[in-house]
């Protein structure tokens, strides 16, 4: 027997929820009276006979009524509802349980419960006669009408006897199935809660168990049968803790055995099953998964289709089905006819792919609840019933037996299926299984992304058919092809795509204006006193500081003249013998670095400097200190005001319900920290309907982060670090205290600072040491789990339809791809994520969106170097190039592999480049940049693959601010090019042979003679160095050494 709700009445192991029973019994009798003639067949009594228990999964109206009304299924029990009595025929134990409801039934609807207890060996015939006699007596008709469920065939001796008694009693029998369908259609709050829990379990099993299981099987190329996957998924449903769902196993069950289909054999009917064939995951294969689970007997369902190296036909069919499915769900709202749901799907198919209309399923699903298929709520083209608030639907849509363009028996025909559990509410609908994404990017797997390549780096081989000889031949042919060669081919294609993309972008680029500064306050706004009467009276003509009005009062010609402290540029004091000199400098137009736009009264006369002498050194130092302090306070306030003026107005935070307040992290720190001199406090981070709120116990320490302002969200659990953190990188700046920032982080330190008072060094096997380490591990695991639970809840909230356009999901940095480098001033461990390159432990934080990167140039790459640098060029050429310096050379191959995997074009160079003039030249003359080959001027290997005839034209684009002085300079420019050819190497080798054995002095003497022969005898050593430095400033490479044994020169580094 399945428990449905909290037990509040009865005794023993089972107890019936009396409150639910009273409420639902009243609903049942009211519905019977209101719809007696149309839905209940004008019945005078309604007889429900529940068959014996069965191991088979089945859905019966009689069992559904037992669970709905009593909370349990009562097998081999007959319940007859009459207008004044309820007769129950059952065993002694069941009768005792139902007997506890007598008072509740009388109070709810004024009926008496009459129990008929059947002995173990009796067929109950005599008790049945009593029930039939009572039905006759309570009816006003000569031939009473008794409603029953006609489709349920009698099972067992008791029910067979009951049907014979009814048939031979002269009572008229009518089918009341439609009445029960309508009764169960609209769910109350308790039922909706059960459906939501079931849907959460279903989506968690698919998302956290089934998908990782499939990915592992495919990745490891295992032979796993559909039936084996079915068994594993069923075990995951029955043990919710496996998928991190905290539901009691006693309350959960499967709606049907999980369905896995692939290999061209598909059945989209609700009663489909998984066969014993192996999962087929070769190219162009389709995998259909359907999962259904129950909580307290209430059903939920989800179905997804996964595509492996899909063909264009499969892509189009899936996208069409997805749009049709979403269109159908959009029509699930109160007041609509159920036929409108199916018609919306048909309209999408007719518009986007009319050839697929014959393949569309004949229904868009059914109602779901205590029964997996509530037949009265069929979402087909003929059902004109109205959708009501509280109904729950399994919106299921499929395309079956579509012909593909492949010849393989396993892939020439395919089917697609999508299903979601949808609740009808006052706002329209809620997709309860939304955490399971059906977006194409989340269900399509590509293991052969480059169709033009000779061989794919990752190849999924078929495990269900013999490998063809041609495939084996290709693999053997490609054994000599290294990863480097594959990467080089991919990078060449990326270079072509990147140059085309850059050309398109530069063709439409516009020049920005302005310096990005916020509005400055004009000088006429800086008013200390509105009129003369407000100036305080001062008896002594000495310098005074008015803190309240932010003014400095200076004695000039016998009067106290006020100056707003913002007009003061600086103040100094100097003591000479007994005299102190105070000098005050003011902001005036025309000074270097001054903003003249602040001075509106251009014709006015401004005081630039004033000097005072005093014989009171104590007063002089006090005045200077007061002016400096007041000026600093006002400057800080004005700076904060200017920063706030540049902020983008955010939407207002909508405080969530009590259920949403459960999404909360307690006792977390924030970075950047709030200002102020008080002790720093931890706070609470709460997720609300449209944003986060962080607050401490101080009322002025509060930060709101709107979901719409979040560009990237990261969750980094503590592994080798001391903190577990959540980090938000924003689209627009916000203020945290008085700091303007785009990065906000919340963290908890996972290790406590412990100081050993004994002072002696403890052994590694010391029990206290072991206990302390275990305590630290437990604390770290507990904090990581708390953060993980918070992240999971927020991700589920973000998966709702209203946040779909934000594309938000917490990203976890991939530590195995991380590397050390210096992005700012100190070395840090930099980690890639799926969308970014981040460093979130040390400040300032580093967050680089991969989508904003134009190219990456790996600099100082060469043999013998211990480290190299990475220059990241952004698509916005006005943005400074980001440099990450001193990356260990051991990380080079891993970084190149990561860049290639993420489709980022990278180049390598032997020296650092001066990127500012390069980008300026590109912006000033984009057409020349495009004509000269785009980014290929960075390609060191370009000259290796070209002939001598085209060598000069293929040197690439070398930006330069200087014009060539003569043709001779152009002729000699090969030795200074960023791209060095093999010819240079050969010349160097020849020169080395000629010069072998000569000393440094001989070489220097020969060089001087050669200079004099060329008319350059006037050039001094200093001039030669200056010309050489100038050449390097144009981002040209230094000349190679023309002899062996020369000491390696230190390569200058330009930013």
UniProtKB/Swiss-Prot annotation:
Q: Which GO terms describe its molecular function?
A: nucleosome binding
At the top level, the lineage of the source is Eukaryota
Classification via InterPro entries: Creatin/AminoP/Spt16_N, Creatinase/aminopeptidase-like, FACT-SPT16_Nlobe, Fact-SPT16_PH, FACT_SPT16_C, FACT_SPT16_M, Pept_M24, PH-like_dom_sf
Identify one Pfam family in the record: PH_SPT16
Task: Give the record's GO CC terms.
Answer: FACT complex
Similarity comment: Belongs to the peptidase M24 family. SPT16 subfamily.
Q: What is this protein called?
A: FACT complex subunit SPT16
What gene name is given for the protein in this entry? SPT16
């Amino acid at each position: 027997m399945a428990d449905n709700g909290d037990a509040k009445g009865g005794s023993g192991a089972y107890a019936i929820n009396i409150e639910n029973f009273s409420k639902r019994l009243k609903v049942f009798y009211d519905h019977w009276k209101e719809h007696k003639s149309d839905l209940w067949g004008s019945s005078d009594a309604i007889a429900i006979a529940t068959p014996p228990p069965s191991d088979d999964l089945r859905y019966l109206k009689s069992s559904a009524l037992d669970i709905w009304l009593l909370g349990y299924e009562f097998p081999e029990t007959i319940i007859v509802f009459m207008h004044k009595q309820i007769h129950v025929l059952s065993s002694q134990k069941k009768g005792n349980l139902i007997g506890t409801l007598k008072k509740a039934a009388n109070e709810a609807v004024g009926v008496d419960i009459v129990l008929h207890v059947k002995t173990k060996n009796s067929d109950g015939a005599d008790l049945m006669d009593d029930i039939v006699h009572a039905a006759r007596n309570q009816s006003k008709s000569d031939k009473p009408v008794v409603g029953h469920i006609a489709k349920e065939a009698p099972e067992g001796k008791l029910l067979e006897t009951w049907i014979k008694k009814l048939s031979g009693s002269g009572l008229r029998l009518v089918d009341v199935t439609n009445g029960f369908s309508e009764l169960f259609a609209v769910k109350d709050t308790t039922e909706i809660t059960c459906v939501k829990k079931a849907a959460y379990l279903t989506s968690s099993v698919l998302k956290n168990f089934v998908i990782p299981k499939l990915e592992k099987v495919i990745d490891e190329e295992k032979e796993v049968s559909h039936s084996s996957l079915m068994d594993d998924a069923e075990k995951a449903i029955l043990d919710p803790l496996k998928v991190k769902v905290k539901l009691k196993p006693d309350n959960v069950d499967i709606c049907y055995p999980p369905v896995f289909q692939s290999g061209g054999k598909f059945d989209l009917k609700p009663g489909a099953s998984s066969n014993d064939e192996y999962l087929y995951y070769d190219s162009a294969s389709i995998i259909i998964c359907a999962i259904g689970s129950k909580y307290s007997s209430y059903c939920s369902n989800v179905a997804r289709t996964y595509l492996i190296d899909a063909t264009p036909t499969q892509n189009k069919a899936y996208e069409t089905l997805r749009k049709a499915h979403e269109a159908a769900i959009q029509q699930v709202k109160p007041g609509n006819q159920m036929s409108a749901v199916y018609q919306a799907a048909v309209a999408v198919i007719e518009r986007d792919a009319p050839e697929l209309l014959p393949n569309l399923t004949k229904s868009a699903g059914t109602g779901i609840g205590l029964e997996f298929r509530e037949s009265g709520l069929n979402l087909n083209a003929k059902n004109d019933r109205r959708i009501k608030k509280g109904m729950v639907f399994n919106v299921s849509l499929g395309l079956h037996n579509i012909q593909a363009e492949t010849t393989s028996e396993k892939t020439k025909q395919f089917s697609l299926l999508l299903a979601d559990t949808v609740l009808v509410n006052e706002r329209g609908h809620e997709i309860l299984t939304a955490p399971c994404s059906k977006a194409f990017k989340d269900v399509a797997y590509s293991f052969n992304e480059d169709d033009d390549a000779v061989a794919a780096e990752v190849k999924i081989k078929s495990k269900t058919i013999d490998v063809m000889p041609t495939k084996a031949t290709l693999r053997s042919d490609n054994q000599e092809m290294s990863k480097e060669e594959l990467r080089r081919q991919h990078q060449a294609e990326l270079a072509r795509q990147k140059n085309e993309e850059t050309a398109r972008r530069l063709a439409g680029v516009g020049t920005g204006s302005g310096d990005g500064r916020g509005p400055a306050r004009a000088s006429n706004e800086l008013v200390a006193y509105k009129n003369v009467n407000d100036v305080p009276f001062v008896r002594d003509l000495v310098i005074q500081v008015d803190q309240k009005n932010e003014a400095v009062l200076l004695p000039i010609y016998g009067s106290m003249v006020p100056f707003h402290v913002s007009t003061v540029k600086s103040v100094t004091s100097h003591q000479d013998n007994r005299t102190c000199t105070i000098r005050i400098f003011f902001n005036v137009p025309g000074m270097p670095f001054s903003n003249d736009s602040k001075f509106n009264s251009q014709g006015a006369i401004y005081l630039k400097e004033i000097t005072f002498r005093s014989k009171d050194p104590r007063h002089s130092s006090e005045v200077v200190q007061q002016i400096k302090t007041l000026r600093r306070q006002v400057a800080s306030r004005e700076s904060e005001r200017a920063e706030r003026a540049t902020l983008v107005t955010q939407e207002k935070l909508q405080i969530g319900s009590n259920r949403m307040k459960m999404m909360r992290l307690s006792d977390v720190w924030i970075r950047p920290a709030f200002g102020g001199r008080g002790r720093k406090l931890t706070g609470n981070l709460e997720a609300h309907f449209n944003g986060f709120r962080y607050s401490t116990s101080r009322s002025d320490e509060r930060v709101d982060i709107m979901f719409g302002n979040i560009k990237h969200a990261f969750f980094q659990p503590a592994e080798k670090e001391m903190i577990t953190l959540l980090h938000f990188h924003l689209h627009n700046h916000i203020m945290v205290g008085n700091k303007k920032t785009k990065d906000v982080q919340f963290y908890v330190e996972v290790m406590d600072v412990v100081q050993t008072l004994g002072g002696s060094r403890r052994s590694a096997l010391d029990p206290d040491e072991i206990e302390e380490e275990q305590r630290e591990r437990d604390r770290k695991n507990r904090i990581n789990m708390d953060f993980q639970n918070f992240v999971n809840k927020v991700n589920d909230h973000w998966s709702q339809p209203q946040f779909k356009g934000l594309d938000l999901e917490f990203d976890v940095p991939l530590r195995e791809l991380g590397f050390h480098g210096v992005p700012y001033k100190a070395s840090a461990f930099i980690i890639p994520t799926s969308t970014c390159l981040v460093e979130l432990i040390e400040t300032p934080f580093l967050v680089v969106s991969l989508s904003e990167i134009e190219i990456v140039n790996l600099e100082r790459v060469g043999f013998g170097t211990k480290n190299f640098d990475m220059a990241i060029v952004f698509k916005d050429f006005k943005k400074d190039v980001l440099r990450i310096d001193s990356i260990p050379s051991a990380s080079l191959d891993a970084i190149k592999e990561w860049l290639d995997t993420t489709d980022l074009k990278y180049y390598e160079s032997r020296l650092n480049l001066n990127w500012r003039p390069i980008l300026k030249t590109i912006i000033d003359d984009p057409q020349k940049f495009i004509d000269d080959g785009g980014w290929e001027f960075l390609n060191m290997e370009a000259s290796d693959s070209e002939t001598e005839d085209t060598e000069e034209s293929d040197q690439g684009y070398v930006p330069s601010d200087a014009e060539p002085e003569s043709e001779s300079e152009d002729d000699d420019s090969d030795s200074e090019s960023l791209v060095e050819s093999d010819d240079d190497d050969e010349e160097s080798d020849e020169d080395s042979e000629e010069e072998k054995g000569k000393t440094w002095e001989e070489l220097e003497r020969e060089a001087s003679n050669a200079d004099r022969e060329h008319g350059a005898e006037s050039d001094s050593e200093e001039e030669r160095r200056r010309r050489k430095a100038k050449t390097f400033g144009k981002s040209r490479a230094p000349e190679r050494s023309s002899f062996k044994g020369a000491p390696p020169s230190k390569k200058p580094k330009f930013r």
